[in-house]
Amino acid sequence: MDFMIQAVTDIGNVKETNQDSMSVKRLCTSQGTMVFAVLCDGMGGLSKGEVASAAVVKAFEQWMWQKLPELANTSIEEFALKLQWEEVLRSHNRDIQEYSRRIGCSMGTTAVVMLLTQNRYYIMNVGDSRAYELQSNLCCLTQDQTLVAEEVREGILTEEQAKNDPRRSVLLQCVGASDNIFPVMYSGEVKQDA
């Protein structure tokens, strides 16, 4: 399977600093070509979101070089991958909180991490950074962890109401600004021509 990779970030219309960080790598393994990607969006309402997002991306790059080769020598086990990614996110949640306290400012970031193998995808997210599949249409593979998205899932708000709700960017959790985080794992089959 061939992988076409493109990655772009944009500062947007509100922020003075681009607080996005990302890394995308194509890897040759004994199991075939894989793609590992991580995208973090520093929280604009907090100072130094770019520091938090860069720290989490760097941590996942280290995981990729140190741990992924071992996992890739055999078939990827989702549970082992989930535990390792949760540990990266939770340890950096603590590290970012400690650093924030030391320097006296708040910082946080959302995160979405993805591993594509020849036939499966594995995704984990915290916050509202998303992963999509593009085939004949665009399909979101993750769920936002925001107050408004949660209210839509619970039937409190409709999709239409959510689009204009002033609370739509209120996160339920993020790395660095939440005491506890509960990353969500998604997996599925990689579709041909997607």
Residue spans for each PLM region:
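PP2C/PPM-type serine/threonine phosphatase catalytic domain
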Residues: 1-194
